[in-house]
Regions:
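Sec-dependent N-terminal signal peptides
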Residues: 1-10
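Carbohydrate-interacting regions of secretory-pathway proteins
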Residues: 13-37, 44-294
Length: 294
């Protein structure tokens, strides 16, 4: 009985959501993991790209947690994740083929609960100065973004575009025109992607138009055909997001559990920029206005 209680206590300590940073070859990238105590223990992991995937074969041994890295396709010898709980931090590694190692550190994800409703500030036109208020995510990458007829245009696959300003809580209006089979995204605080995609006539899904990629599924999907302008009105307060697409509320004050693939970092408690995804296909944006909380 004592052993069972100790195990339950340790599982509870490890349980929860963790904002992770992986370091490999001097480069860092964000990850996120959600650990469910069980029994049996389970969870989900968000790697640097793609969407959050379920964990299997989770083993908790004292203050340690171990599991094979999840993948969408079967892998004969998956990399192994191991980390130890030290206070409110996780420290560990991902060990891959050939004994390659990626260092992982993490902290418990903040609740981001707001005690009082925000007081909204002055609206900001994010295109008022053209493209001057934006910067490429990768300064050395191919930058296909330009201003044309008051629109922010991406002509093809290249780097993402990021606002120079950062925001905490805000209301964002943004209009988008997606071509046939087009794919882009609107990253809130640079960490949580609202999917932008040619999904006319498709059912709602967390990886379809308006979904929080791999995290939150819309209630409906009033997407318009490719080539037509569509309007988003997004309110983001703490972890809570409301998404209105073409006048219909498709996500209503839903919690975003954690970062999505392609996030700039995993520091969820900090302000972050608006990032527009440009590494997939051509896309056009216009009328981008944000009202930050004071």
């Amino acid at each position: 009985m004592v052993a069972l209680l100790m195990l339950a206590s340790l599982q509870t300590g490890l349980a929860g959501r963790w904002d992770l940073t992986a370091t490999s070859g001097g480069l860092t990238y964000p990850m996120w993991v959600e650990i469910l105590a069980g029994p049996p223990p389970a969870g989900r992991l968000q790697n640097k790209s793609g969407h959050a995937l379920p964990l299997t074969a989770v083993v908790i041994d004292g203050n340690w947690i171990h599991f094979p890295m999840p993948s969408e396709e079967p892998v004969a010898n998956p990399a192994q994740f191991s980390a130890v709980l030290q206070g409110d931090s996780l420290t560990g590694e991902i060990r891959g083929p050939g004994n390659a190692r990626i260092r992982v550190t993490g902290s418990r994800a903040p609740a981001l609960e707001r005690a009082t409703p925000p007081v909204w500030g002055t609206p900001i036109d994010l295109l008022e100065g053209g493209i001057a208020g934006w910067r490429p995510e990768d300064p050395k990458g191919k930058n296909n973004w330009r201003m044309a007829n008051g629109e922010l245009v991406n002509s093809g696959s290249g780097t993402n575009l990021i606002t120079r300003a950062t925001f905490t809580d805000f209301k964002l209006h943004i209009e988008v025109n997606v071509p046939k089979a087009g794919n882009s995204g609107i990253y809130l605080r640079g960490r949580h992607e609202v999917q932008v995609q040619d999904d006319y006539g498709k059912p709602p899904h967390n990886r379809h138009m308006g979904g929080i990629y791999g995290q939150v599924t819309p209630l409906s999907l009033p997407a318009r055909p490719a080539g037509e302008w569509q309007a988003f009105d997004i309110t983001f307060i703490g972890r809570r997001v409301t998404v209105v697409l073409n006048g219909t509320t498709i996500i209503d004050n839903a919690e975003i559990p954690g970062i999505t693939g392609g996030a700039l970092d995993s520091r969820e408690g900090e302000p972050g920029p608006i990032m527009l995804q440009g590494d997939h296909t051509a896309v056009r944006y216009r009328n981008i206005r944000i009202v930050p909380a004071r």
